[in-house]
């Protein structure tokens, strides 16, 4: 804890799931309730976490992050359900987004495939059907960051980039802090300190 901070799996991988859910939904978390566990002998920090989320406007969510789940290799998964339908995306199958409108059959939307929009095309580096994902996502971030730096130096136009900022980092720290406070209060709901 002296070097890693308050969160184990929560700080390592949970913050990414938290940020992804907030970014994709466009919603901010108001309160959460967390149950943190450590299954490894002698571990001071969590290696498994279950978190109930209450978003602004009444939306609800659940987050599970674990570093002790055999058979799941960085199994980041995001599911969103609303009044119009649902979305389901898994990092282990990153080129496919499952989209289901209420009362209709599920559609599989492929990365940069038919019906993709301009944002999808801009983020894709190879044609549809070729594997692409994790490393290319970092390349997109670095490329956008470099373009923003060049623009700030007057050496180009400011790109239409979507990058995480300091606010996202602060929000991630507030998320870990709230989870630890909740767990220490027997899983009581607590507000994020912003």
Give, region by region, the residue ranges found by the protein language model.
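Short glycine/proline-rich turn/loop motifs
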Residues: 1-2, 121-129, 150-157
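Predominantly a Rossmann-like dinucleotide-binding segment in NAD(P)-dependent oxidoreductases
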Residues: 1-43, 49-53, 97, 122, ...
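Active-site rim elements
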Residues: 5-10, 127-134, 158-166
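A structural signal for well-ordered alpha-helical segments within the folded catalytic domains
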Residues: 8-11, 15-19, 136-143, 167-177
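NAD(P)-dinucleotide binding in Rossmann-like oxidoreductases
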Residues: 36-46, 56-140
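Short loop/turn microsegments at loop-to-beta-strand junctions
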Residues: 48-49, 160
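C-terminal helix-rich "cap/oligomerization" subdomain common to oxidoreductases
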Residues: 143-194
């Amino acid at each position: 804890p002296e070097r890693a901070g308050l969160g184990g799996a929560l700080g390592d991988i949970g913050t990414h799931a938290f940020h992804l859910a907030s970014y994709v939904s466009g919603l901010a978390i108001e309160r959460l309730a967390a149950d943190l566990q450590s299954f490894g002998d002698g571990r001071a920090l969590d290696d498994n976490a279950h978190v109930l989320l209450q978003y602004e406007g009444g939306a609800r969510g659940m987050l599970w992050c674990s570093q002790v789940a055999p058979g799941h290799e960085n199994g980041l998964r995001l599911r969103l359900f609303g009044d119009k339908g649902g979305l389901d995306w898994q990092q282990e199958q990153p080129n496919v987004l499952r989209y289901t409108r209420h009362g209709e059959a599920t559609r599989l939307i492929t990365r940069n495939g038919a019906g993709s929009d301009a944002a999808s095309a801009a983020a894709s580096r190879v044609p549809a059907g070729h594997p692409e994902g994790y490393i290319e996502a970092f390349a997109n971030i670095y490329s956008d960051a470099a373009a923003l730096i060049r623009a700030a130096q007057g050496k180009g136009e400011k790109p239409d980039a979507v990058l995480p900022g300091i606010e996202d980092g602060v929000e991630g720290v507030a998320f870990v802090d709230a989870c630890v406070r909740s767990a220490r209060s027997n899983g009581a709901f607590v507000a994020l300190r912003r």
